[in-house]
Amino acid sequence: PGPLCERVEEKSGGTCVYLSGSIGGLMTPDSRAENFYEVTRIGASVADLALKGLENPTASEKKAALGWRFEIIRIPVENSRYLLFLPALKFGHKIYDSAGRPVSGWKIFRLSLKHALRRLSAAERPWVESEVSLIDIGPARLLGIPGEIFPELVIGGYDGRFRAGHPLINPENPNPPDLKRAPKGPYLKDLLARPLKLVVGLANDEVGYLVPEYDFKVQPTLSMTP
């Protein structure tokens, strides 16, 4: 984001606002160099693409209508490490029990201790509060996701249409996903009824990676197993 914003502001004279997108897939260059060359190169390349897009915009409005709404959601805490260090989650989050009642500070510590001694049952596990948001700016609609969502949940692509000449599944992957279990559409962008659709990650929260269920494998011996 740093080099990207710097280049946009240098060339446009305005203020650049950077929003994360669907960054859950960890699709980064395989660079072994211990420097920031790739950061600068990619930031400048993306900035130039953004500026080029402004030369011939598909839509523009001088007075765009603005709308905003959000939905509070609650997510069960199942990760064993999160349960052990549950007091750390209370900073910036509201925590509830399975019946929807707020959990006070000392009870949070007690839950962590109980989990360390005998593992919490599903009924005893706490829930953490987060939110999903939607912003309309003229013809654009932004969906705010409180985490790092995998791109295939946003646009699909299980049929290989976005692979750009690369194999859909790495042949060296020791745990390849079963694409037969991949979700069918419509995907998130398909549901945004606007000409311009954006899915923004890390929107007001970071609950972790949002992984397609078919691509989520956990070995029973791992300490993070619920």
Which residue stretches match the model-derived regions?
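Non-catalytic substrate/cofactor recognition surfaces at enzyme active-site rims
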Residues: 1-226
